[in-house]
């Protein structure tokens, strides 16, 4: 039986930390869907379509990974794809507290819903999209924070 998972996020932009978690997920699951949330409430730096495009570029060499956008409840997106497992990355205890609440809420919406938590490698544990956006706003170098394939998208 093939097992698939969804790795949801805003990916504003996708980072080396995200890519690390995606690669780890491919070692556990036969298929990984990177689900790029529209997330208008977060006021993203990059448009939804641009974030989808960057995610596709970042994972293009991973054969069992696909990228899709979504703008509905994660549980509904998962059901529509026949997948009941999501991957979430954890960098710190603060991530765990937030992700645990979200995981419980999703399970309350669909009792077959499972959340698997993965940690990025130590050298990527500090990276977040928020840090990348902050560095970008100050014209800093993010080449060690994001996949090389998307750097051209981040240049003003």
From Swiss-Prot:
Positions binding substrate in this chain are 10, 42, 74, 88
* Family assignment from sequence similarity: Belongs to the bacterial CoaD family.
- Quote the gene name from the UniProt entry: coaD
As for subcellular location, the record says: Cytoplasm
EC numbers on record: 2.7.7.3
Pathway terms, separated by semicolons: Cofactor biosynthesis; coenzyme A biosynthesis; CoA from (R)-pantothenate: step 4/5
Q: From which residue to which does any coiled coil extend?
A: none
- GO molecular-function annotation terms? ATP binding; pantetheine-phosphate adenylyltransferase activity
GO BP terms in the entry? coenzyme A biosynthetic process
An example Pfam family from this entry, by short name, is CTP_transf_like
The scientific name of the source species is Campylobacter concisus (strain 13826)
Q: Name the residues annotated as site: Transition state stabilizer.
A: 18
- Kindly give the InterPro entries that the UniProt entry links to this protein: Cyt_trans-like (IPR004821), PPAT (IPR001980), Rossmann-like_a/b/a_fold (IPR014729)
Cross-referenced CDD domains: PPAT
Q: Which cofactor does it need?
A: Mg(2+)
Recorded GO CC terms: cytoplasm
Q: Tell me, what does this protein do in biology?
A: Reversibly transfers an adenylyl group from ATP to 4'-phosphopantetheine, yielding dephospho-CoA (dPCoA) and pyrophosphate.
Under the heading SUPFAM superfamilies, the entry gives: Nucleotidylyl transferase
- Tell whether ATP-binding is among the UniProt keywords: yes
| Key words, A-Z | ATP-binding, Coenzyme A biosynthesis, Cytoplasm, Magnesium, Nucleotide-binding, Nucleotidyltransferase, Transferase
Quaternary structure (record): Homohexamer.
Which residues are recorded as binding ATP? 10-11, 18, 89-91, 99, 124-130
The protein in question is named Phosphopantetheine adenylyltransferase
Q: Which reaction does it catalyse?
A: (R)-4'-phosphopantetheine + ATP + H(+) = 3'-dephospho-CoA + diphosphate
């Amino acid at each position: 039986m093939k097992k698939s998972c969804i790795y949801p996020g805003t990916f504003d932009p996708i980072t080396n930390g995200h890519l690390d978690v995606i690669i780890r997920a491919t070692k556990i699951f036969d298929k990984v869907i990177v689900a790029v949330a529209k997330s208008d409430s977060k006021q993203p730096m990059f448009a939804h379509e641009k974030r989808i495009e960057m995610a596709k570029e970042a994972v293009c060499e991973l054969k069992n990974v696909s990228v899709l956008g979504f703008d509905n409840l994660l549980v509904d997106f998962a059901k529509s794809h026949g997948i009941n497992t999501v991957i979430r990355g954890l960098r710190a205890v603060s991530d765990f507290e937030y992700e645990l609440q979200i995981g419980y809420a999703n399970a309350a919406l669909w009792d077959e819903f499972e959340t698997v938590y993965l940690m990025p490698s130590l050298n990527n544990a500090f990276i977040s999209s928020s840090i990348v956006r902050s560095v970008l706003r100050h014209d800093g170098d993010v080449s060690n924070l994001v996949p090389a394939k998307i750097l051209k998208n981040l240049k003003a």
